[in-house]
Amino acid sequence: MSFRLQPAPPARPNRCQLFGPGSRPALFEKMAASAADVINLDLEDSVAPDDKAQARANIIEAINGLDWGRKYLSVRINGLDTPFWYRDVVDLLEQAGDRLDQIMIPKVGCAADVYAVDALVTAIERAKGRTKPLSFEVIIESAAGIAHVEEIAASSPRLQAMSLGAADFAASMGMQTTGIGGTQENYYMLHDGQKHWSDPWHWAQAAIVAACRTHGILPVDGPFGDFSDDEGFRAQARRSATLGMVGKWAIHPKQVALANEVFTPSETAVTEAREILAAMDAAKARGEGATVYKGRLVDIASIKQAEVIVRQAEMISA
């Protein structure tokens, strides 16, 4: 049978994931005090090779020593193609304690990549008697990753989220751009003699969303590199939200408020969703499967759409 129930994703806010390099511990307290739902302390791209060991020590000290409040606390480890990743996993699991919620696995190209990390994590958890299972977020940032996105989404019960890493993805795909997310000047459509810029990421985002929703995982948009362009960030985030993504990375503190703004349902949207649910309740009481709301048809499928908005708003306000 082709039909199966679609599992629900983790019920936690994930509007903004704020990144900070492990080599800059002075930033950690500010990150902990930010309005981001998720904190990603980074051991990968933002840390120079010679600084990896010290960055790892900085992060472990901060996880154990700082008050992170209700933040979902994550560490991006180094890629499996480096000599650093296993030490990242071993030291974090053995030294960081239960406050660590998640590790982010970069450059995942197939399910076996996730399995390799899962096997190591599971062995350490058993050896240490860790009772809180560590969750995973993976980053799709290669042609192989997007080609195998569904098998990756199904690869581990630890997997809670999946992001698109735009820069490495663009390089792997041979895309002619140096931009990180957002619209690209040479990627446009012609309409009435004018250019209407689009972005080359939406098809990959849609593939990630479909795989995530099939397997009960949170789909997350990746970085927007130009942190001087607030409107560009908002526009990219709105497109991602429309596709079904639940949040976006922030690579600069000023992007946190922008992400929270876009991925928090507005009062108008929530009110309209509740009104649609009420209208459909009234229709069902009359024995009808559809009704008219503000001049447009709403039916049973509209209930599901409205419930998505209401659930998201209630989860954020809880």
Curated annotation (Swiss-Prot):
InterPro entries: Aldolase/citrate-lyase_domain (IPR005000), Citrate_lyase_beta/mcl1/mcl2 (IPR011206), Pyrv/PenolPyrv_kinase-like_dom (IPR015813), Pyrv_kinase-like_dom_sf (IPR040442)
Cofactors named for this entry: Mg(2+); Mn(2+)
Enzyme class name: lyase
Presence of keyword Cell inner membrane: no
A GO term, aspect molecular function: (S)-citramalyl-CoA lyase activity
Residues holding Mg(2+): 141, 168
Keywords linked to the UniProt accession: Lyase, Magnesium, Manganese, Metal-binding
Family annotation (Pfam families): HpcH_HpaI
Activity control mechanisms: Inhibited by EDTA.
Catalyzed reaction equations: (S)-malyl-CoA = glyoxylate + acetyl-CoA; (2R,3S)-beta-methylmalyl-CoA = propanoyl-CoA + glyoxylate; (3S)-citramalyl-CoA = pyruvate + acetyl-CoA
One BP term from GO: oxaloacetate metabolic process
EC assignment: 4.1.3.24, 4.1.3.25
Cofactor remark: Divalent cations such as magnesium or manganese.
Induction trigger: By growth on acetate.
Binding annotation for substrate: 19, 24, 30, 76, 167-168, 251-252
Known role: Involved in the ethylmalonyl-CoA pathway for acetate assimilation. Catalyzes the reversible condensation of glyoxylate and acetyl-CoA to L-malyl-CoA and the reversible condensation of glyoxylate and propionyl-CoA to yield beta-methylmalyl-CoA. It is also able to catalyze the cleavage of (S)-citramalyl-CoA to yield acetyl-CoA and pyruvate, although this reaction is not involved in the ethylmalonyl-CoA pathway.
Subunit composition and interactions: Homohexamer. Dimer of trimers.
Family: Belongs to the HpcH/HpaI aldolase family.
Protein name: L-malyl-CoA/beta-methylmalyl-CoA lyase
Species the sequence originates in: Cereibacter sphaeroides (strain ATCC 17023 / DSM 158 / JCM 6121 / CCUG 31486 / LMG 2827 / NBRC 12203 / NCIMB 8253 / ATH 2.4.1.) (Rhodobacter sphaeroides)
Name of encoding gene: mcl1
